[in-house]
């Protein structure tokens, strides 16, 4: 912990952001969301500040977390991945969303895509209930999730992950 000359303190952290080593000085109470936005990760959105919407979802050590609820100090020595670090996979899934017309206002897209990509890596042949549970933290204001499920079923089938009924 360092003093900043004004009576405050800062911490030095080192972490990997989208595969690149980063070194930063942060305030002990700084949230991961704020750090990521300062680093130019604009796919990370803040919609509620109460962990209710899922817009701020990122991966910490390959697991989805809500960056509005994680202290930046917790990423010291760890790997953080944002949508910017998953552009190839994200663009592939976004094509499915566009083809199916499931992308209306785009409010939920960042968190939804991050969770879908994490789920695809973690679960083989998920059931509809497993999918719903995995994506439960994503707030969608437009579609009621019907079109999201349709796109996800098609995506999983074409990726060879299928879906158990």
Where are these regions (language model features)?
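Signature of N-terminal electron-transfer/Fe-S-associated modules in redox systems
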Residues: 4-165
